[in-house]
């Protein structure tokens, strides 16, 4: 009878473990894993935290799950033993738009993630090229010794000649 109980407990334990392994992750959990993986590569630099996420319209566990979310720098650095969720955002912290795919099949998972800077937030500085003086080719090389000038000119014409040979 004791052997039957041990077998029963073993079967129940295996069933629980297999159910947990096959449990479908929620989108929020996948995004948390993606941010955790992104922050692991930032030794000594500020950690990023979730700002907003856009879940996919449908989630099929047999296919790639598209990821789309925004993250922002926090006050915590990766050397500290703190979770980014416990950290405040930096006031002028960098924001990034992240896209990727999460794929899970049986026991293997795959995550592809790209986080690009949010250029729409950055202030653009317009520079006028009219303010700069137009410097001629000869004026650029007035202070350069003649031997160096000749080497430069020869290299310039060799490069142009090689480019034109390809056409």
Curated annotation (Swiss-Prot):
Signal peptide coordinates: 1-21
Keywords, alphabetical: Disulfide bond, Protease inhibitor, Secreted, Signal, Thiol protease inhibitor, Tumor suppressor
Organ and tissue specificity: Expressed in myeloid bone marrow cells. Expressed in neutrophilic precursors (at protein level). Expressed in myeloid bone marrow cells.
Keyword Disulfide bond carried by entry: yes
UniProt GO cellular component terms: cytoplasmic vesicle; extracellular space
Function of the molecule: Acts as an inhibitor of cathepsin B (CTSB) activity. Plays a role as a negative regulator of tumor vascular development, cell invasion and metastasis.
Protein's name according to its UniProt entry: Neutrophilic granule protein
Source species: Mus musculus
Gene (UniProt): Ngp
